[in-house]
Swiss-Prot record:
Involved in protein export. Acts as a chaperone by maintaining the newly synthesized protein in an open conformation. Functions as a peptidyl-prolyl cis-trans isomerase. One of its GO terms (biological process) is 'de novo' cotranslational protein folding. Residues 163-248 form the PPIase FKBP-type domain. This is Trigger factor. It comes from Bacillus mycoides (strain KBAB4) (Bacillus weihenstephanensis). Consists of 3 domains; the N-terminus binds the ribosome, the middle domain has PPIase activity, while the C-terminus has intrinsic chaperone activity on its own. It catalyses: [protein]-peptidylproline (omega=180) = [protein]-peptidylproline (omega=0). The lineage of its organism: Bacteria, Bacillati, Bacillota, Bacilli, Bacillales.
Amino acid sequence: MSTKWEKLEGNVGVLTIEVDAKEVNNSIDAAFKKVVKTINVPGFRKGKMPRPLFEQRFGIESLYQDALDIILPKAYGEAIDEAGIFPVAHPEIDIEKFEKGQNLIFTAKVTVKPEVKLGDYKGLAVEKVETTVTDEDVENEVKALQERQAELVVKEDGTAADGDTAVIDFEGFVDGEAFEGGKGENYSLAIGSGTFIPGFEEQVIGLKSGDSKEVEVSFPEEYHAAELAGKPATFKVTIHEIKTKELPELNDEFAKDADEEVATLDELKTKLRTNLEEGKKHEAEHKVRDEVVELAAANAEIDIPEAMIDTELDRMVREFEQRLSQQGMNLELYYQFTGTDADKLKEQMKEDAQKRVRINLVLEAIIEAENIEVTEEEVTAEVEKMAEMYGMPVDAIKQALGSVDALSEDLKVRKAVDFLVDNAA
């Protein structure tokens, strides 16, 4: 087999591939063995039709497409290896010559991975992030715990205020007609939570148990139910009960209820401070890593093929679909609720997809430029770390991974980011 690679404009080139006649004949033979199994001919058992009779009745040309399906993937794969190129999309194949006893000649128009011209990626100036934890930070955490342990108690003589919970009956009307999903009984409405239509909760403030009121609101223009979007509505509301939060007293008992590993309020505050410090440090490290990567990517020159962005968009949509399924939703429901479609979703994701592709290409280029490698011991250590994290045997992790090649590449990327951080200004 012979291969010729001709680079065209941008990231496109043409492979001209010539395959020996012997391989062509072998592919036609393989195609016959495949096709003959599907043919019933009187006087012969299924799959036993003689080759000469087959060619006489159907013509040898009837085998050519199946033969091409057999020979092309292998020939194309060998050709891109020989040419040392990295396609990022399916090729455009053009068959110039294919017949029994003759060499196969075909061309493949290929979009390849772009050249990356790295800019400055050492000595990048990054902003230092403040990681100090103040007494106020700790007190805010204590207050958050106190809020989570609060009990709702009936507000006997009071009126509804922001932060209270009103137990209500409601029924909504648009143009004087009740609408589907607009009615509820004994519904616990947390005032100020923003769970109802804008303007609804504010009009409940000041009401008391036993009060009734007509609440006038308008549905948002982007409301998920298109038939209601932008329309004014009237809700008849009856208040059954007003509840308010009763916060627990801040003492050692509160601390023990909040965290069984502590015995006093002071111990709880110390633990909260430690957790906050670790969290801020972790957040600062991530911010620096993200910043150096984005700076290195911005400094590079790359002509990114649309095919790479399209591939990344498809991957992002699949990831989004998986997240939706974990919430009991699917894409069709999402499109219905948001008034979008597949094209609009991809358009929203396109900027992030471009950013992802650029960053990946730049990190790959840095790995090559700095000769970043991963040892077998480092891969083994990472597998053992994963086994401990997931509580699984090491062999089970290895089996789940199948090949450690992807893990090895991930570790190289991590090392590349480490390199950028270590060499930042």
